[in-house]
Amino acid sequence: MAQIKIEIAYAYPERYYLKKLTVEEGTMIQTAILQSGILQQFTEIDLRENKVGIFSRPAKLTDQLKDGDRIEIYRPLLADPKEIRRKRAEQQAAQAKKK
């Protein structure tokens, strides 16, 4: 089988991890992540919980990789976006009443 080149990315707000790998054509996302060693380096990653994607598009762990793909492992959201918007609207309403 042919070899393909891929990247695996995992980011924090202040820094990011990017690893280049060569894998067999047809390798699944999960297999590439396991081969990369990222799970040992970042023990907070749980593939049952963390979502993954290819170039910002959601992907499944069983999806096959193509040459040049960048696997992105997403961190869980710290806060619910709907809840943040609701709180912001409440704060703005409270400030408007004070004026």
From Swiss-Prot:
UniProt cross-references to PANTHER family, sorted A to Z: UPF0125 PROTEIN RATB
Top-rank taxon, per record: Bacteria
UniProt-recorded name of the protein: UPF0125 protein PM0166
Species the sequence originates in: Pasteurella multocida (strain Pm70)
A Pfam family the protein falls into: Ub-RnfH
Family, as annotated: Belongs to the UPF0125 (RnfH) family.
Disulfide links within the chain: none
